[in-house]
């Protein structure tokens, strides 16, 4: 499939005049752009593959090459279609719109207004920061051929699964994408190794959390995942750590991994387990997606369904703000008890309300859940705050989650993050309330995910940041994206980086750490903040498995050696 010429032409010609976003290195510190070999080849360069090259490559991958036609193309130029454009705009906030595309991403900032459906019709449709082409991967051979072609032609390679990444790691100007989304195999089987004996599932790299949960449930099984059904499991989620409703019960997503089946940058097909290629296993399991290899499938533990209680609580900020935040404090006070009882909670403080849910209690009765919440409800009654509380006991996590995990409308949240240990949180209750109140007052959303990782949870050594393991809460501080107001979006981005994240960091020793999947892409000192004590070893392994930097993404291990120039070309930093 090849794009209409206007899309390709504008994609190249107009790229340079698009609004730019900051990169970790200034243009001055980069080696010269143009077609310099220190930069990846870019559309318009002499080195860019000819139409005949693309045609031959397309044939070599069985016609699975997709030339990008941005979703917003129906809103511009000669392909404008009023009805379809209205449909695209209406669908834009829903994850499926982007996950089912070979190029679109959920974080609009990294689309850089390329062929933006919300821009006026007369604005040219440019491919811009979307990948130029993507291979709809169906086999290991597709991956190997794409890796070979991209390296032969010095192209920027982008591994993309669902496009959920908050850092824009699954898109890239002038990129050739490996689109993993349609690898949907799902094989439940018995597994035996030194580390684990029991049920397991081997899933293709395109399996999403909701698909996994539904299929496993029918077989009486539960698979660890996050709260969002559209996030992919084998990509950034598990490779980056993987928090979710079952974290306290079974450990992180990464802790479930028994085997990776992957392709290295040099094209070698490889299996990595705790005992075979164990250093690659270690790096892939927590060191961040899109860094060491292209994962074709992974094998993870499967747990038997068990009784699970779900709960939620909401109350508005309707009267005195002081009173509202006393209510929030009452909820904060029970967070350690939820973890101690084996549960997790997700909540968001907005300027107008507190919304708690899902609270998940695996192997917990409704009576236990209600007793944990009783002091909060009593306090809310005493404060005369009207609330809505609900809890329910189910025979499986799947059913509990279906009842208590609210639908996620996810497109376009800009975020920062901080991990908070129990002693820091319980030792300074007023400090956290004041910081959160200050953020909410300025229009920020403060989402918390609480959990507890006991040392009794067995897992092979992996590269998850130890700070993630030691924390009680992962805070995500967000500001909703406004599709029609880029200037305000940039202002909000500055608020996150310069005000919101520092407000939480100020409460933590040495400024604290953050979960590498849910944090600010402009985080200063991200190597330490995201990877902690593992960074040095992870960088050594990057040099072993990907010495030429074939895999690059903002804030991935070794990414500081490359940066984007003003025109978004990816170049080595001198
Ligand atoms: C709405 C929403 C809800 C979320 N909820 C949670 C949550 O509950 N818990 C949690 O821990 N995180 C959560 N996240 C964060 C999520 O885990 C990350 O965004 C993660 O990177 C998504 O992975 P993906 O593969 O689906 O996305 P993509 O954007 O496609 O990829 C993310 C990264 O993984 C790489 N990658 C993808 N596939 C492969 C592959 N096969 N091989 C090698 N590299 C690959 C990409 O190159 C990229 O670097 C959420 C994010 C969003 C937007």
Curated annotation (Swiss-Prot):
GO terms for molecular function: FAD binding; oxidoreductase activity. Keywords: FAD, Flavoprotein, Glycoprotein, Oxidoreductase, Signal. Disruption phenotype: Leads to the accumulation of dihydrosorbicillinol as well as to higher amounts of oxosorbicillinol. The keyword Transferase does not apply. Residues 126-305 form the FAD-binding PCMH-type domain. Glycans are attached at residues 58, 112, 136, 266, 312, 363, 384. Pfam families: BBE (PF08031), FAD_binding_4 (PF01565). Its EC number is 1.-.-.-. The keyword Oxidoreductase applies. Its cofactor is FAD. Pathway: Secondary metabolite biosynthesis. PROSITE patterns: FAD_PCMH (PS51387). Gene3D superfamilies: 3.30.465.10. Residues 1-27 form the signal peptide. Belongs to the oxygen-dependent FAD-linked oxidoreductase family. FAD-linked oxidoreductase; part of the SOR gene cluster that mediates the biosynthesis of sorbicillinoids, a diverse group of yellow secondary metabolites that restrict growth of competing pathogenic fungi but not of bacteria. Sorbicillinoids biosynthesis requires the action of two PKSs. The SOR cluster is required for the production of trichodimerol and dihydrotrichotetronin, with sor2 being sufficient for production of trichodimerol, but not dihydrotrichotetronin in the light. This is FAD-linked oxidoreductase sor8. It comes from Hypocrea jecorina (strain QM6a) (Trichoderma reesei).
